[in-house]
Amino acid sequence: MRSNRQGVYRSLLQDRRTRLLLAGLGASSLGDGLSIVTIAWLAVRIAPANELGLFVGLAVAAYTLPGVIGAVAFARLLRGRPARAMLLGHCLLRAGCLGGIALLYATGMLAPHLYVILLAGSSLMTAWGTAGQYTMLSELGGPEGRMAINSLASAQVSFATIVGPLLAGLLLVWVSPGLLLALDAATFAFLGVVAWRAGAATKAVGEPIDARAAESGFRLLRRPDLLSLTLVTWVFFFLYGPVEVALPVYVAADLQAPAGLLGVYWTTFGVGALAANLITGTIRGHNMRRITLLIIAGWGGCLVPFAFAPIPVTLAAFAIGGLIYGPFIPLTYALFQSSATAVNLPSVLAARSAVVMVSTPLGTAIGGPLVGSLGAAGTLAGSGLATLLLAVVASVLWTGERADAPKSMT
């Protein structure tokens, strides 16, 4: 297995364009890892009096949610454009807006409303940038390498999520948050340059889904296979949302433990997800939808012990949960990449991102009321049970689809 895994990755990394794109994505992921902490910390610094909690929440949301608006607003302009142009546009917008925030903060001119506006502006192309990224990955990896290249990109995100916040916490003791946002802006500029240099890969073989090239992504999402996959992904991420609220309360209130234990939970999860992403790239010739269902059920099962088990058991369950949860994103993207041809893939992925983008924030929003009524442990276990139910429903939903379609998705 190990030699097979190394062979798959070695074959991909022999291509200069693949190395360039992955290097850019890795740098950008690390920059975003820094910004997980930095954006909220800068919001704390400049928040209006008596509005700290509201303003921090608004700033964090502004860095993500306006991408839904951009997915719709820019559809006519970007439909049919090269994938690298979409990714470059996203990178330029991120770099420009984040760089503007850093400059205004350094000169003492960053007002709270300008901060939110610039964060929102930076996220307008998020859906199209993600679409461009995964279209380029699909083209570079080809049918045999999609899972592997998706997994490498996801592994970089997992690594950045582990290291970035820790590094930001250390650096913010010595440097201003504006400087770290300037660094994040530089990583996006770097990604834009290398993505453009990576160029267009060989197009996927096959006819467009419809006679028209670059058809509307939202129209294509009505296809039963794509619609069911999008719905399952949306609900899965929605059910994950309450975990982000309940786990800190579980550690602080239920266990009466220090913040360090919360860090241990998330670190074990992140390490598990990182390892799983690297392993997932070797999956070939398997029924990808069946594996996706097993991931959903497995993650749900790992949350149930929080209702009754001691700390060592829940730590082990959460680490195993990271191993199980980690491959979900590269797997589901591989399913999309194989369900649409290159001409339609960017529009489909942008529409998918616009729909899915709001799921986790909505789940997080209901996490507070759920913790208040069910308790933290009850919310974690309830999320797990609901996720297990989702696996059952999704299994029924996918029963009627063609059995040979998933096998072509590697």
Regions found by a protein language model. Name each.
Residues 26, 97, 110-128, 313-327:
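Hydrophobic core of transmembrane alpha-helices in multi-pass small-molecule transporters
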Residues 118-159:
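Cytoplasmic helix-loop-helix junction between adjacent transmembrane helices
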Residues 22, 26-46, 53, 175-182, ...:
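A single, central transmembrane helix in multi-pass transporters
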Residues 135-139, 181-209, 286, 396-407:
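Helix-loop junctions on the cytosolic side of multi-pass membrane transporters
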Residues 38-47, 102-107, 163-183, 253-254, ...:
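Transmembrane alpha-helix termini and helix-breaking/packing motifs in multi-pass membrane transporters
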Residues 39, 128-141, 327-340:
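Intracellular juxtamembrane helix-capping segments at the cytosolic ends
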Residues 1-19, 200-231:
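Juxtamembrane intracellular "pre-TM" segments in multi-pass secondary transporters
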Residues 57-96, 100-101, 247-248, 252-410:
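C-terminal transmembrane bundle of multi-pass solute transporters/carriers
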